[in-house]
Each structure stands twice: as structure tokens, then as C-alpha cells.
């Protein structure tokens, strides 16, 4: 599954940010609906995907909710006076996370959302059908990537929180938490056309990694990793 300061270890105190007047704080169970909402509002390559999906929670079923439910210690949100407006989510051990989803998350979603016919070309699928296909056939991390960069992350911020260095602060917060839990490395995927995001990750210490199309969730994605 692919879609960012604590001072040391697993220190999870709330951290103020500058300019945005937002707080980075640990995820709470009551934030689950906010994860779904933000995932949808940023689901069209950072833009609002509400008009694209018949089921407004479908995107969050895949990209957001499992992290809050199964990896809450590695989930942080950004909250301002208007409420929660961003999150950073991670899995410590991607292979173990994938296995857990196979046991406890995907089965009920597969029963709810039919798998589109294998013969249906991707370009003919609706956005709902694209996500349904991913639910039935989720990408699995290659062994070589899991060996060095076993953790992965997603970050999404609503437009009102996209300035002032908040993404960088959230990334630092998560990286500190991952180090505190002993992760040797973290990876993420970025759309190949999003050079702004690619530049951001390079700037904060990620390195682009070579990967074949078969080793990526989708051929248009770039793979980045960071040793911790």
C-alpha cells in the first residue's frame, strides 16, 4: 500500500508548527473519520477526488484507515482551529502489515466490493473499480526492498496546511518514531509527474531507488528510500 519532531525515540508530545498554527499530535481513534475525509479530499493527485468516487469511503479503506486501525503508534495528524487537516501514516514492517490486512481487513472489503473482470482494461475502469481491483490484488513489497527499507509511509495535507514547512515537520516526527521502534529504513512512492513532491523528498534525505515496473504498485510511480 502506497500513497510525513519527536526529539528522540518514541517521544509523542504535541509539537507546534510555525506559520500554519497547527499542532502535530498522535493519532486518536476519534480521528478515523478525518483520515477518510482527508484521503478523499486529496485523492486526485493532491486535489479533491469527491466527484470521482461513488463511494466516498472507498479510497480511505485502502490508503488511510488500515494505518489508524492497525498501526496507530505510527500515525500522526496535524490539527488547527478548523480541525484535523493532515496526516502521516506508516507501517513498521510492510510485509507483516500486508499479511495482517490479508487476514483481517481485505476479506470483508472483497465481499463488499466485487473484483472487476480481469479482461477489463484499466483505462475503462471507474475510480471505484480501480480501487476495488487494488483491494482484490494489492501490491506486495519485493523482498529486496523489505530487507533494507521495511517501513513505508503516506502523507496527505489539505491545502490550508500545505505551507509553512508542516510536511517536513511531520516527516521528521514520523522518522523519529520509526527509529525509536528500530526500523532500519523507510520507503515511499511518488507519482512520476509530481516533481515537486520528488524534490521535497530528495531535499529531506530520501534517495530515488531503481525499480522495474513489476516492482512498483503502478509503472508511473517513483520509488524513494531512506536509511534510518
Describe each region flagged by the PLM.
Residues 23-37:
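A short beta-loop-alpha structural element at the N-terminal edge
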Residues 43-63, 101-114:
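Conserved GNAT-fold acetyl-CoA-binding loop/helix
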Residues 53-75, 81, 138:
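Active-site rim helix/loop that mediates acceptor-substrate recognition in acyltransferases
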Residues 73-77, 87, 154, 187, ...:
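Short hydrophobic/aromatic beta-strand element in the GNAT-like acyltransferase core
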Residues 77, 83-92, 139:
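Conserved beta-strand in the GNAT
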Residues 95-154:
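Conserved acyl-donor/pantetheine-binding loop and adjacent beta-alpha core of acyl/acetyltransferases
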Residues 148, 153, 164, 168-169, ...:
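Conserved active-site alpha-helix within GNAT-family acetyltransferase domains
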Residues 149, 178-191:
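Conserved GNAT acetyl-CoA-binding A-motif
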Amino acid at each position: 500500500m502506497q500513497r510525513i519532531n519527536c526529539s528522540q525515540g518514541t517521544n509523542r508530545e504535541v509539537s507546534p508548527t510555525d506559520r500554519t498554527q497547527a499542532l502535530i499530535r498522535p493519532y486518536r481513534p476519534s480521528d478515523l473519520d478525518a483520515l477518510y475525509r482527508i484521503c478523499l479530499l486529496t485523492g486526485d493527485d493532491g486535489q479533491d477526488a469527491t466527484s470521482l468516487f461513488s463511494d466516498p469511503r472507498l479510497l480511505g479503506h485502502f490508503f488511510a484507515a488500515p494505518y489508524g486501525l492497525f498501526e496507530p503508534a505510527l500515525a500522526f495528524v496535524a490539527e488547527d482551529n478548523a480541525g484535523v487537516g493532515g496526516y502521516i501514516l506508516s507501517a513498521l514492517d510492510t510485509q507483516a502489515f500486508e499479511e495482517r490486512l490479508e487476514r483481517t481487513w481485505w476479506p470483508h472489503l472483497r465481499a463488499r466490493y466485487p473484483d472487476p473482470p480481469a479482461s477489463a482494461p484499466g483505462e475503462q475502469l471507474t475510480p471505484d473499480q480501480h480501487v476495488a481491483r487494488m483491494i482484490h490484488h494489492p501490491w506486495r513489497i519485493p523482498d529486496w526492498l523489505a530487507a533494507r527499507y521495511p517501513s513505508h509511509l503516506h502523507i496527505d495535507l489539505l491545502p490550508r496546511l500545505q505551507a509553512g514547512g508542516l510536511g517536513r515537520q511531520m516527516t521528521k516526527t514520523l522518522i523519529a518514531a520509526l527509529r525509536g521502534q528500530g526500523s532500519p529504513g523507510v520507503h515511499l512512492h511518488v507519482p512520476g509527474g509530481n516533481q515537486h513532491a520528488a524534490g521535497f523528498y530528495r531535499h529531506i534525505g530520501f534517495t530515488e531507488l531503481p525499480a522495474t515496473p513489476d516492482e512498483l504498485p503502478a509503472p508511473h510511480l517513483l520509488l524513494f528510500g531512506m536509511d534510518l
